[in-house]
Design a protein with these regions (language model features):
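C-terminal edge beta-strand
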Residues: 23-36
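A short beta-strand micro-motif common to beta-rich folds, especially ectodomain repeats
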Residues: 3, 9-22
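OB-fold nucleic-acid-binding modules
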Residues: 34-178
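Short, surface-exposed beta-strand/loop "edge" segments at domain boundaries and coil↔beta transitions
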Residues: 9-10, 25-26, 102-108
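Beta-strand secondary-structure signal
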Residues: 2, 15-17, 28-30, 61-63, ...
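Strand-loop-strand motifs at the edges of beta-sheets in extracellular beta-sandwich domains
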Residues: 1-5, 93
């Protein structure tokens, strides 16, 4: 069957019912077609904040490539809770994405360590629903917070094409790129 594009400004829902009468088995699946959204480029995401601050999204999405394996240690600075206690959750909930062209990158913070499922080279579509983009200055860097595993749709797993550049092509904007 074909599903028509959602051209209205509201969500559409449907319930699909499956039944295997011979076995007495049935199931229901509720499907939601979301409000049409905008696809952002990395340059457009960065342009939303011209100085330190935050931008909250209602929807929308962008494409990216994961530059690290989720769940690895040393993904971020783990804060000291006391003289003998470290919060390792900071690294466990951090990963990094770059644009498909390799020009810009950003840090992502997912809700839990279990949500940090991306692998290096995964090409993904990232839903920005309920996400917050944070810009910090000195150095200028961007973090996307409020994501869960459900925000990522993997288009190709672990085999995104490498982007080659020389040292002369790398500048201050290349923070969080591979």
């Amino acid at each position: 069957f074909n599903v028509a594009a959602n051209e209205i400004k509201s969500e559409r829902t449907a319930t699909i019912k499956f039944e295997l009468a011979e076995k007495g088995v049935s199931a229901e699946l509720k499907v939601t077609q979301i409000i049409p959204t905008k696809q952002y480029s990395f340059a457009e995401l960065r342009a939303l904040l011209t100085s330190a601050g935050e931008y909250k999204f209602d929807g929308d999405w962008f494409e990216a490539v994961a530059v690290a394996d989720g769940g690895k240690e040393n993904m971020d600075t783990d804060p000291m809770l006391s003289a003998s206690s470290i919060d390792y959750n900071e690294s466990a909930t951090t990963n990094y994405l770059q644009g498909v062209d390799g020009k810009y990158g950003l840090r992502i913070k997912v809700a839990t360590a279990a949500d940090n499922t991306l692998k290096r080279g995964d090409k993904v579509k990232v839903s920005l629903t309920d996400a917050t983009l944070v810009r910090e200055d000195n150095p200028v860097r961007y973090t996307l917070k409020g994501l869960t595993a459900n925000c990522f749709t993997i288009e190709s797993s672990g085999n995104a094409a490498s982007v080659s550049r020389t040292v002369s092509q790398i500048g201050d904007d290349d923070i969080y790129t591979l």
